[in-house]
Amino acid sequence: MKASLGSIVREARELFRHHGYDGASMQDLATKVGLKKASLYTRFPTKEALVPEVLILTNEELFAELPEGDPLAAYALVLERIARGLSQEIRCVGLHLAYGASGPDTPDAAVAVRGFFTGQRDRLAALIAPSVGEVRARELAGDAIARLEGATVWTVVEGDVEPMARALRLSLEEIASTPRR
């Protein structure tokens, strides 16, 4: 069976999401995608090499097919996608990788993790900056991500998705009530 790069990256994302960086193994990934471990290493020389690809894919999915001509609707849609993903999957692959693969032993992964979150913030901010200004847009986007990511605590420890719904609602209310330029 010949596994596509996309299928390898998607399966790696699920392993990272559910087992963290340290708990995910190249052998487990090879087994999941139907490859020998040696074949997997010809495509990705290290586990760390998968991290940027996993995070790029995740952000590409979040920002895919946004409504044109309505940046506020696009902003809301991305936040809804983040909230839905975190509620359904329970764990954020970005946070798992931030805790497990962002130290001096994994410098490329650390750069990718930082880029994942700052990239989300900056792309969200770019959507709303024409309406609220660059500084305020960056604050709103950063706060929204922090709220949504923080709400995963209650999804994980109590199975309660209501804090996620409130975090989304508060983030959308905040942008709606921010004075326009």
Locations of the language-model features?
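Short, charged helix-capping/linker segments at alpha-helix termini
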Residues: 22-23, 130-138
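Hydrophobic/aromatic residues within well-ordered alpha-helical segments
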Residues: 47, 54, 58, 62, ...
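Hydrophobic alpha-helical connector segments
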Residues: 53, 64-91, 141-144
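Solvent-exposed, charged/polar functional surfaces in cytosolic regulatory/catalytic domains
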Residues: 57, 61, 65, 81, ...
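Amphipathic alpha-helical packing segments from all-alpha helical-bundle domains
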Residues: 73, 77, 106-131, 142, ...
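Amphipathic C-terminal alpha-helical segment
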Residues: 85, 145-163, 174-181
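Amphipathic alpha-helical segments used for helix-helix packing
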Residues: 86-114
